[in-house]
């Protein structure tokens, strides 16, 4: 072997020239400690807040949340048992993002946008978007003026929800909160079957900390009723790590924003944000952030406000798209003055209160119409609904007041008795079975019959039968009236024909 002196001296010179340079360890760090889904890592000097990192030895990813002077606190998206002290951690150089686009419709994904429904990879992804972005400012927005039809009479008549609104659904466990949300998704089948893209309403259902069986049941219901085709389900079940439960609403929101920013309409349901707050509290306490009220961190209000502010109605210059948010909050023993409920009530544009007592009295959906409110109000209703439902709120309020007095006195005058009878029938009329949302023209006819006195002579127990037979009669004999209400969105031109149809039906009903 021939060794040339010149080569050796060149190698030695280069070694000497490079001697003493610092090795750059900014993109690779090592684990100092790990436990409870949190890793403390040394050496990731240039990592950004919210950046993805990878643990190559364990094959899991994480997100940098705490950037401290001598270490970085990382939350782990997965099982931390395979991670050991001293393991290598690599920066991925990207903030957490998810795939967005119409290719996700009909799919069930995890909070990182990976499919978990066994139907193979997601096709035709439009782009990838960061999960946590700034909400639109004041200038790109427009006031809410188009309705989101939930298909539930109690909501569409009294607490109307508009496209771009944030309407909270709040109540104890087992009061039908998810049922209201699922019915809203099912009711969009008719508009999504049409060809008018400006009327379609795509749906995103985000399940946070739910049982897997519950999520599977909801997906099955949507699939059986043909609603999964226009719905994305984002699932972070109770068995998933807290960081994924915390991330799920943001991932779903990024998917919804793609529709909003491309001139389409979407509604997103967060079921429920109480569990997201609990997951965030767990992460924050493990990261040693200082606790505040009810041990939640100080920025839990900001967590929910920055999420819900992303629901918006955009103006003409920005494509007229909208994202409507229906967050769900679970209360304990009807206590709406707890920390998270009061926070979310103050962020949203109204709330739908569901009550256990009403639920067990058989009033379902169990909406307490007295304290539920929509701050957008009748600007989110079509003209026909305003005309039909105008008197109903006042009549129900008077009914509740008189019903409270009627408990004490037996000798009631005729006007009071009439008011009580009308209120009972209207309350009965607002009942509705699950998975049977009504089209807006059917609701207009039902509510018009109730508020204009056509139910006053019907026994309360017969109101449900009267309504179903009335709608069958209208479809059979007066489909033209229903079509006109649906297309013209106004009662004026058909009101006289509707009155005579109702009078004829009321006379024949027995």
Swiss-Prot record:
The keyword Translocase applies. The record marks 372 as: Required for activity. Keywords: ATP synthesis, ATP-binding, Cell inner membrane, Cell membrane, CF(1), Hydrogen ion transport, Ion transport, Membrane, Nucleotide-binding, Translocase, Transport. Its EC number is 7.1.2.2. Transmembrane segments: none annotated. One of its GO terms (molecular function) is ADP binding. Belongs to the ATPase alpha/beta chains family. NCBIfam families: atpA, PRK13343.1. This is ATP synthase subunit alpha. It comes from Phenylobacterium zucineum (strain HLK1). The gene is atpA.
């Amino acid at each position: 072997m021939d060794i040339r002196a010149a080569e050796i001296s060149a190698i030695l010179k280069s070694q000497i020239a490079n001697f003493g340079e610092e090795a750059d360890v900014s993109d690779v760090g090592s684990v100092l400690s790990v436990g409870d889904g949190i890793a403390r890592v040394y050496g990731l000097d240039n990592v950004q807040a919210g950046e993805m990192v990878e643990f190559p030895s364990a094959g899991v990813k994480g997100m940098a949340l705490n950037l401290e002077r001598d270490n970085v606190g990382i939350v782990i998206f997965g099982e931390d048992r395979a991670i050991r002290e001293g393991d290598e951690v690599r920066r991925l150089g990207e903030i957490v993002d998810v795939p967005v686009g119409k290719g996700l419709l009909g799919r069930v994904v995890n909070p990182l946008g990976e499919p978990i429904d066994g139907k193979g990879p997601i096709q035709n992804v439009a782009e990838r978007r960061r999960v946590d972005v700034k909400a639109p400012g004041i200038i790109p927005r427009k006031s809410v003026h188009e309705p989101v039809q939930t298909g539930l009479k109690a909501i569409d008549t009294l607490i109307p929800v508009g496209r771009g609104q944030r309407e909270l659904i709040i109540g104890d466990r087992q009061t039908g909160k998810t049922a209201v949300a699922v019915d809203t998704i099912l009711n969009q089948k008719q508009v999504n079957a049409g060809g008018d893209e400006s009327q379609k309403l795509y749906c995103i259902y985000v399940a946070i900390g739910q049982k897997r069986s519950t999520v599977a049941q909801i997906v099955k219901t949507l699939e059986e009723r043909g609603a999964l085709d226009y719905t994305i389900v984002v699932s972070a079940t109770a068995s998933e790590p807290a960081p994924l439960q915390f991330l799920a609403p943001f991932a779903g929101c990024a998917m919804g924003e793609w529709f909003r920013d491309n001139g389409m309409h979407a509604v997103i349901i967060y079921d429920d944000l109480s569990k997201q707050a609990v997951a965030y509290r767990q992460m924050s306490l493990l990261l040693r952030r200082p606790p505040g009220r009810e041990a939640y961190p100080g920025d839990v209000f900001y967590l929910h406000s920055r999420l819900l502010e992303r629901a918006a109605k955009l103006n003409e210059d920005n494509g007229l798209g909208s994202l409507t948010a229906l967050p769900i909050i679970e209360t304990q023993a009807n206590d709406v003055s707890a920390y998270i409920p009061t926070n979310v009530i103050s962020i949203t544009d109204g709330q739908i209160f569901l009550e256990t007592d009403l639920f067990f009295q058989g009033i379902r959906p169990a909406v307490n119409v007295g304290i539920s409110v929509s701050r957008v109000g009748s600007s989110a209703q079509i003209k026909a609904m305003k005309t039909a439902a105008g008197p109903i709120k006042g009549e129900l309020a008077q009914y509740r007041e008189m019903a409270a007095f009627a408990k004490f006195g037996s000798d009631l005058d005729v006007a009071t008795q009439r008011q009580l009878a009308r209120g009972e029938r209207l309350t009965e009329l607002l009942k509705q079975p699950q998975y049977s949302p009504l089209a807006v023209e059917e609701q207009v006819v039902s509510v018009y019959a109730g508020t204009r006195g056509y139910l006053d002579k019907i026994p309360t127990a017969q109101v449900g039968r009267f309504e179903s037979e009335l709608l069958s009669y209208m479809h059979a004999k007066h489909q033209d009236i229903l079509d006109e209400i649906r297309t013209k969105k106004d009662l004026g031109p058909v009101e006289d024909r509707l009155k005579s149809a109702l009078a004829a039906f009321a006379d024949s009903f027995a």
